[in-house]
């Protein structure tokens, strides 16, 4: 219902809805056609809150794949446990996390999508990110089954996606729990959208794409995923 307004902003660079939707489509097609992901499979996002992690969640949801959000500051043993327990079919990781986690990811044998800070940067900030990325590549080992995010979203491939999947699980979140080990929270597409509808009035976005909301909460947190990100985007705020 909205025009091609500004949808996201990263390092001062704005991106319109058309660009974000194109990247969602390209990723969804890659997951289905190249990685062979199917409805009910699990894919792990081991990332902070970034443009890439938000786009990837929607791409996975389009084809009925469950997103497992894992806190990027958790250690390699925890990541290994989550990959195994949830039977993840792949993982997305930020290049800055390579030092402590490349061993676990390579040992898992899972395909990996590597994200760079420069993916959605421009100008001097992009150049600065590129310098750091070059140093990382020169110092640390490489992922065995890796493709770079920036290469995936270059394509124009499209897929139909799953229809009427409201009651399917959309995401796994890891709660702290009151006792014992971390608990896995299951969120359906319906629960995400119903909560968004019930509280969407608190946003009151009057100028789509121009009024912005700063996202400081993580996606592995229910409030961060649903209220801070999904609700804001549904109300046409620029995030």
Residue ranges and their predicted role:
Residues 1-34, 39, 119-143, 160-163:
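N-lobe entry segment of adenylate-forming
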Residues 6-38, 44-50, 54-58, 75-80, ...:
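Conserved AMP-binding/adenylate-forming core of the ANL superfamily
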Residues 16-18, 161-163, 170-197:
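Conserved AMP-binding A3 loop
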Residues 21-27, 152-156, 166, 185-206:
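Conserved structural elements of the adenylate-forming
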Residues 44-46, 53, 57, 61-94, ...:
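Short beta-strand->loop structural element characteristic of the AMP-binding/adenylate-forming
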Residues 64, 193-212, 220-239:
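Conserved AMP-binding/adenylation subdomain of ANL enzymes
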Residues 74-106, 195-214:
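Conserved ATP-dependent adenylate/AMP-binding module captured primarily in the ANL superfamily
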Residues 125, 137-174, 181, 205-212:
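Conserved pre-ATP/AMP-binding loop-to-beta segment of ANL
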